[in-house]
Structures are given as structure tokens and as C-alpha cells.
Amino acid sequence: MSIRKQYDSDLEALKTALVEMGQNAAEAVENALEALCTADTAAAQKIVQGDDRINNMERDIEHRCMTLLLRQQPVAGDLRHISTAMKVVTDIERMGDHASDIAEIIPHLVTVRKEGDPAVSQAIAMGRKAYQMILDAMDALTAEDEIAARRVITADDAVDYDFNAIKHTLAQEIAADPAKVDAALDLLMVIKYLERIGDHAVNVAEWVQFVRTGRYKDESMF
């Protein structure tokens, strides 16, 4: 195999590893939402324990990127792909972390929130939007689809709206009954993590735009 063909093969393997990691992070978020919906503390614990797998995948991808950079002197297009992978891997890892963060809250949350709690239902609906953003961002990354990436960025407005609406509901809840502060704070942390997951999906989408254009947040890089 020629040096160029080997290099192309290594780049494709890097992309495959990145997509697989994204799928694992998305699954962790989906499972966290399901555990929240069903008050399943055992499932929540499994999510926390499974976070190491995503962390290990991050280290593997970072190693692949550094190997590609050290073994070759990539031209602009290749360098954009490697640089994007090094940035995106951090956002994906944080998505997995936030799924684990939510899972850690669930055992206490289910003791202070009744089944069918409307604020929890709103948080789950918000989370499903953030989860869909992950799927769409990873699809955009796989296809290097700038238009799809733009849709992910736009979708974040709905997640932010939900975050502010639920936060307002929780503030009213505390004002009406200060004894509910723990229950409110637990859910506030959950929606904050969900909001951050949406932000990380946006970051992935913005790096997709960079791969296609060489511009990141409207600034030319290379």
C-alpha cells in the first residue's frame, strides 16, 4: 500500500472511531433520559460505570490524531480533518460526562420528586431535543454536511428556550415553598447538563462547517 493510501486509510479509521464514540455518547444520554423517566436507579448506576469506555475512546482518538500529525506533514484539507477530530473528541467526551452527571443525580432526585412530576416531564422533553441534536450533529460530521450542521446550530434555540422556561418554573416552585429547594436544585442541575449537551452538539456542528470551509465561527483559520 502506498504512503498516501495508508494515510487515507488511517484518516478513514479516525473518522470511524470518532463516529463510534459519538454513538456511545448519544446512547449514554438516551439511557440517562430513560432512567430519569422511569426512576431507574440501577440503570443510572450503569451509565456512571460506563463513562470510562467513552473516556478510553477519547484517548485512543487523541493518540490516532497525534500519530497522523507526527508521521506525515498533512496538507490543508487533511489537517482540517485531524484538527476537527481533536476538537470534536473533547465535545463528545463532555456529552458522555454530562450523561453520567445526570445519572448521578437520579438516585436522590427520585426521592424528592413524585412520579409524573410535570417539571421532570418538561426536562425529559428538553433532553430529547438535546439528544436529537447529538444524532444530527454526528450525521452531519459523518457526511461532512454543512447545511445539516447549520440545522443543528439553529435547533439549539429550542433547547435554550426550554432551559429558561423550566428554570423559571423551578424558581417559582422555591418561592412558593422554600422547603422544595433541594428538589428544585436537583432538577436545575439536570437541565443545566442537558443545556450543555446541546451546546456541545453545536460545537460539533461548527467544526463540521470548518471542515467544509476552513472557517470557524466565521473566522478563517486554514
List PLM regions with ranges.
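Cytosolic, long alpha-helical scaffolding segments
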Residues: M1-F222
